[in-house]
Amino acid sequence: MENLNHCPLEDIKVNPWKTPQSTARVITLRVEDPNEINNLLSINEIDNPNYILQAIMLANAFQNALVPTSTDFGDALRFSMPKGLEIANTITPMGAVVSYVDQNVTQTNNQVSVMINKVLEVLKTVLGVALSGSVIDQLTAAVTNTFTNLNTQKNEAWIFWGKETANQTNYTYNVLFAIQNAQTGGVMYCVPVGFEIKVSAVKEQVLFFTIQDSASYNVNIQSLKFAQPLVSSSQYPIADLTSAINGTL
């Protein structure tokens, strides 16, 4: 099975976002749900580990922007850009939404790789100047695994399976990037992304899609880029630091 980042397949099965010589840190965080606790995948590109806690705090805040989807997706949750804008106004220290997107991307009976490239172009526009080489690697890997390698992720908490028909599978996929590097300067960028994906294939096929397979897609992408001045871990209350270490944030 081919993958765009040329990572060994065994690495993808364990961690589909792993890329060679990457500095990204992958942290799973819990989101509130009326029925159960679920996870939101957070991919953090942090040059200075002194700001890891800030990345966790931002991801924790945007967890509350995961909302139920339309009837086609049943009880699935996805990141909502409008809800994310509301939450951005409540985050302290104060930051600002730099850009946001709510866009549909479609294709008819074309290779999965074509859809991946279309989605990448949308998200590259949202991320903007934060796109260092390693960030592009992580973004490409994350988007690739939104559409492929799904059998290895089918029970993971960042993917929600919606209603199925005889010829269509619906699912949502949620991921969040926190970025602090030379390109971001004195701020951290937090970029939550929610996908609603309708694909004209049965689930058994979708689970084993590769980039060479062909399918028709209707994908809704909702995302925003939130910029917050850098906050040293020492500036957070000790209770927040303890919670982050224990994974209870």
UniProtKB/Swiss-Prot annotation:
Gene Ontology cellular-component annotations:
extracellular region
Coiled-coil regions listed: none
Q: Which domain of life is it from?
A: Bacteria
Q: Which UniProt keywords apply?
A: Plasmid, Sporulation, Toxin, Virulence
The positions making up the signal sequence are: none
For this UniProt entry, the molecular function terms from Gene Ontology, in alphabetical order, are: toxin activity
Q: Which GO terms describe its biological process?
A: sporulation resulting in formation of a cellular spore
Gene3D superfamilies per UniProt: Delta-endotoxin CytB-like
Q: What does this protein do?
A: Kills the larvae of dipteran insects by making pores in the epithelial cell membrane of the insect midgut. Acts on mosquitos and black flies.
- The name on file for this protein is Type-1Aa cytolytic delta-endotoxin
